[in-house]
């Protein structure tokens, strides 16, 4: 019984080792997924957030005024959507 457990463990460890070696050699050959992910998540200067004169949703509004469509929450000091009880 112990001998069978040891042989199963060694077989499983061998399969894991074989998988790791195959994966490492394949990842060296193929850089396509890495290149694809880097091109998808590349940050372009056109998409960077601009500094505005007004504060957007959930931004602090003590020093800045909230943008149109938002009101400054008196409790949290954040720009939030206007609700019927805040008007």
From Swiss-Prot:
InterPro entries, alphabetized: Huwentoxin-1, Huwentoxin_CS1
Source superkingdom: Eukaryota
Q: Provide a GO CC annotation, any one.
A: extracellular region
Protein's recorded name: U3-theraphotoxin-Hhn1q
What does the entry note on its domains? Answer: The presence of a 'disulfide through disulfide knot' structurally defines this protein as a knottin.
Taken from the UniProt record, the cysteine pairs bridged by disulfide bonds within this chain are 54-67, 61-72, 66-79
Ordered alphabetically, the record's keywords are: Disulfide bond, Ion channel impairing toxin, Knottin, Secreted, Signal, Toxin
Q: Hey, what tissues is this thing expressed in? A: Expressed by the venom gland.
Q: Which residues form the signal peptide?
A: 1-24
Instruction: Give a yes or no for keyword Methyltransferase in this entry.
Output: no
Primary role: Ion channel inhibitor.
Similarity remark: Belongs to the neurotoxin 10 (Hwtx-1) family. 51 (Hntx-8) subfamily. Hntx-8 sub-subfamily.
Which parts of this protein are propeptide? Answer: 25-52
Where does it localize?
Secreted
Task: List the molecular function annotations (GO) for this entry.
Answer: ion channel inhibitor activity; toxin activity
According to its UniProt entry, this protein's organism is Cyriopagopus hainanus (Chinese bird spider)
């Amino acid at each position: 019984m112990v001998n069978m457990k040891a042989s199963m463990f060694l077989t499983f460890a061998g399969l894991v080792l074989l998988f790791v070696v195959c994966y490492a050699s394949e990842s060296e050959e193929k850089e396509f997924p890495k290149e694809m992910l880097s091109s998808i998540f590349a940050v372009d200067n056109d998409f960077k957030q601009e500094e505005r004169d007004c504060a957007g949703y959930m931004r602090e509004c003590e020093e800045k005024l909230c943008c149109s469509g938002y009101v400054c929450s008196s409790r949290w000091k954040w720009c939030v959507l206007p609700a019927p009880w805040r008007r």
